[in-house]
């Protein structure tokens, strides 16, 4: 499981500031269905700016993304990457199967026909026409907002029940259901690891805790898993 901390060293700011604001916006205004209904232009502009940021030259996968992709490649079919992040740095770092439980900046969804358009690199607005049903005023960011059900939960729960090792990397340990994954994994007998800049709120639930930069600690942990 990876969170915002793994992408921080790639120039993607951790979304939520200490004052609870998201890039100077209230969470309710830019990350809820109600906020989108109230002011769709504000919400579209907010995510358009974040999507555009992914295309900046200085935003590149870092050593932690690359190390996890290497782990996946070394153990084909045995490593599931679940991320709370909405960027594409895991994929650009070489990862193949990534479960984006909170959606992706690079996909948009139609409220009318529920179709999802992947590899969406352009801006999206209320005027954007759905390529499938050809209606306007219905395209929204394919992001899981507060109050919405995260994606892939059935798959994730099955993988947790069958895993032998579970690691949470760069996560706050405060956002559910992801914060509860460690308890599920331990219940089923997995060895558990937390890798964070500093111990998270849920660090006591893990058997092994590594503190430091993701670009240092993750490659080191991957080496230990492969040896």
Predicted features by range, described:
Residues 1-227:
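Conserved catalytic core of sirtuin-type NAD+-dependent deacylases
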């Amino acid at each position: 499981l990876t969170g915002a901390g793994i992408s921080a060293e790639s120039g993607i700011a951790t979304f939520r500031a200490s004052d609870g604001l998201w890039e100077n916006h209230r969470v309710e205004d830019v990350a809820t269905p109600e906020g989108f209904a109230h002011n769709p232009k504000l919400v579209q502009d907010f995510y358009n700016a974040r999507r555009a940021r992914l295309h900046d030259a200085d935003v590149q996968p870092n050593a932690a993304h690359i190390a996890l992709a290497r782990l996946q490649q070394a153990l084909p079919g045995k490593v599931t990457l679940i991320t709370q992040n909405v960027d594409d740095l895991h994929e650009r770092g070489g990862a193949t199967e990534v479960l984006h439980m909170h959606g992706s900046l690079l996909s948009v969804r139609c409220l009318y026909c529920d179709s999802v358009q992947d590899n969406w690199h352009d801006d999206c607005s209320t005027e954007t026409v759905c390529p499938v049903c050809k209606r306007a005023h219905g395209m929204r960011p394919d992001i899981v907002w507060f109050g919405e059900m995260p994606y892939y939960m059935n798959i994730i729960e099955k993988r947790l029940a069958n895993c032998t090792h579970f690691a949470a990397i760069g996560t706050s340990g405060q956002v559910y259901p992801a914060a509860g994954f460690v308890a599920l994994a331990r219940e089923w007998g997995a060895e558990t690891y937390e890798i964070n800049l500093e111990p998270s709120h849920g660090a006591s639930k893990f058997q092994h805790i590594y503190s430091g930069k993701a670009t240092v600690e993750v490659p080191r942990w991957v080496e230990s898993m492969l040896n």
